[in-house]
A protein has these predicted regions:
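Bacterial Sec-dependent N-terminal signal peptides
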Residues: 1-27
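Mature, folded catalytic cores of secreted/periplasmic enzymes
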Residues: 19-29, 86-91, 127
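Flexible, processing/modification-adjacent segments and terminal tails
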Residues: 20, 37-40, 146-149
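Early exported N-terminus immediately downstream of N-terminal targeting peptides
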Residues: 25-85
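Localized chelating/binding microdomains
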Residues: 64-67, 121-122, 148-151
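Surface-exposed, polar helix/loop patches in the mature regions of secreted/periplasmic/lumenal proteins
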Residues: 87-146
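Short, low-complexity, Pro/Ser/Thr/Gly-rich segments in the mature regions of secreted, periplasmic
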Residues: 143-155
């Protein structure tokens, strides 16, 4: 009798643990991210390719107010990491940035966001989802007309 009660209690405990773990996983996937959280969390993933250029490196180029660039590429990461990034990009919620462009073509989601302060672009963030996700952040004190010149030059 004691053995039956013990086994029953053990089964109840296992079922509750399983339900809790599943709920925690669902909650994490549905979590809203800010830009900073997105970069901080996913920059630590295994096999991520990181490139950071700071002020010293930027001084060698005519960068039109750009003081730094960060690029994180996840094409070598595991599929579950890519899926988590794609979900995070989809659920992004950061009111301190304005959306410049948002596209979703054939499962590839791209968002271009800007943070503007006192008539200057302080940050440009490019988020790309899909099979080869990437996060790009460009920091500086950029005049909007300089961005327009670069776009026109590259057309």
């Amino acid at each position: 009798m004691k053995k039956s009660i013990f086994i029953t209690l053990l089964m109840i405990f296992i079922c509750q643990s399983s339900i809790y773990a599943k709920n925690a996983e669902v909650a994490q996937k549905e979590a809203k991210y800010t830009i900073e959280q997105l970069f901080k969390e996913f920059s630590k993933e295994k096999n991520v390719t990181r490139v950071k250029l700071g002020g010293f490196a930027m001084s060698f180029a005519d960068t039109k107010g750009v003081s730094g660039v960060e690029v994180y590429s996840f094409d070598e990461c595991a599929d579950n990491v890519k899926n988590n990034i794609n979900t995070a990009i989809k659920n992004l919620d950061d009111s301190s940035y304005d959306t410049l462009v948002s596209t979703n073509e054939k499962g590839e989601r791209t968002k271009v966001l800007v943070k503007i302060e006192k008539d200057f672009i302080k940050e440009i963030v490019v988020l790309t989802g899909g099979d080869d996700p990437a996060l790009i952040k460009i920091k500086g004190k950029i005049k909007p007309e300089d961005v327009k010149k670069v776009v026109e030059y590259n057309q």
